[in-house]
Amino acid sequence: MKKILFILSIIFIGCETQNNKDNATWSFDASTGDYIEWQSENDFANEMTNAAFVHLYNVEYEKANVFFEKALEYDPSLFGPHVVLAGLAPAGSEKEAMHVEKAKENVAEKNETSKVFVSLLDLPRQSRWWPLIGPGAHDKWSEMRTLEPKGKLIHYYYAFSIPGMENKISEMESLLAELRDGVGDSESLAVSGDHSFMIAPIVNVLGY
């Protein structure tokens, strides 16, 4: 039964978002690990990026698109929004190609975790959730998780992309325990930021 709910919730995630949006403030200290370098020196760009994450986790792609584009208006040097926006652009379009080019250009001086994240764009576009999920994506997320096990976005997509439904459920439950109860592998527990806005989407995915 849980497997069925998991599959259905991947398609129909979206409830319980308002409380999450109230938490859409950037309180993350990137100096605590080798995370994907999403942060900007521009506070408005950070606010837009964090708001985009809330919509992304709740599969509100049109809204996520708006906020990621706004983040780039405030800080064109960011690479992270370009990765997501490439996947939201029509396949094979000039817009997709532009976002891929900009992501690779802007990540050149960033850390290894960030470069592996951008390398998701090198995977074939064979999934509606490309480049974050699809053939080959789990290997990339696994590499990122090895580089920085505390990263919660990394853990989320590591769990979502892992082969096998039982494995997906197990990893999502582990992530939920970390976020909601502060229980889990000490190397994986978050040490900075408020990730509570991720709890409801994970609960929805699990079908609880």
What kind of feature is each model-predicted range?
Residues E16-Q18:
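Bacterial signal peptide processing site
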Residues F44, S77-F79, E148-I154, S186, ...:
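Residue-level recognition of tetratricopeptide repeat
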Residues S31-E47, N106-F117, A190-S196:
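TPR-adjacent "capping" and linker segments in tetratricopeptide-repeat scaffold/adaptor proteins
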Residues E41-F67, V118-L132:
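Alpha-helical segment of the N-proximal tetratricopeptide repeat
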Residues T49, G80-V84, K115-V118, Y156-Y157, ...:
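Alpha-solenoid helical repeat scaffolds
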Residues K95-V107, L132-R145, K168-V183:
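Alpha-helical repeat scaffolds
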Residues F12-G14:
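C-terminal motif of bacterial Sec signal peptides marking the signal peptidase cleavage site
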